[in-house]
Amino acid sequence: MYIQLEGQILSYEKDGEGSPVILLHGNGESHEIFDVLSQQLIKNHTVYAIDSRGQGGSATPNSYHYKDMAKDVILFITSLEIEKPSIIGFSDGGVIALLVAMEQSDLLSSIVVCGANLSPKGLNGSALREIKKLYKKNGSPLVQMMLVEPNINESELQKISVPTLICAGDDDMIKPKETEKIFHNIPGAKGHIFKNATHSSYVEHSDALMSVLPVFWGEE
């Protein structure tokens, strides 16, 4: 499916029935990383799996900024009149989920933020080196975005007024202190660290999140 939002065309998949959930993938990926999780979620939820701008089946923009991607999600929710969705965002998608909730918590019922950072300094040294190496090799503006953004300060997180679950792997490329900083600055946030998990292993092609989502959403 496609939707045009103020000149930006986004590709997305919709499936299932029940309270709405929006899935946001990481940098250079597509909604397909959520294939296994979606199959569990659609049993009780209407799932909207979005390809962020310039990724998957979505149109390539003139430039890449997390705030523009967050605006896309806000317009997606309001244009389709999705009532109080929960957002699950991984990596870049987690950053976008934070920005949406900072801007318009009133649109949402909750956010689940997996492996997000507040700034490039929140990445560990080896991850940052790999991203720099990749940018040197391919010059991708999408990769460059990770080297200069996001720039979220702790006080901005306190604008978030929806139930929030912060997740990370115990072997994540996000520094543990960064995850703790996000957790401690969002009022009432809950947190979960996945054992024996990397940045992506508990999210991509995995339903490991189902071990925490029903409890967080009050479905158990």
Set out the residue ranges of the language-model regions.
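Conserved HGGG/HGGXW glycine-rich cap/lid loop of the alpha/beta-hydrolase fold
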Residues: Q8-A59
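Active-site loop/oxyanion-hole signature of alpha/beta-hydrolase fold enzymes
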Residues: V36, Y48, S52-S86, S211
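Conserved hydrolase catalytic core segment
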Residues: E83-K121
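Active-site nucleophile elbow and catalytic-triad environment of alpha/beta-hydrolase enzymes
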Residues: P141-E156
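Short beta-strand/loop motif that positions the catalytic acidic residue
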Residues: I160, I166-A168
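Conserved alpha/beta-hydrolase "acid-adjacent" motif
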Residues: M173-E178
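Catalytic histidine neighborhood in serine/cysteine hydrolases
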Residues: T179-S200
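Catalytic active-site module of serine/aspartate enzymes centered on a nucleophile-bearing elbow/loop
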Residues: N196-E220
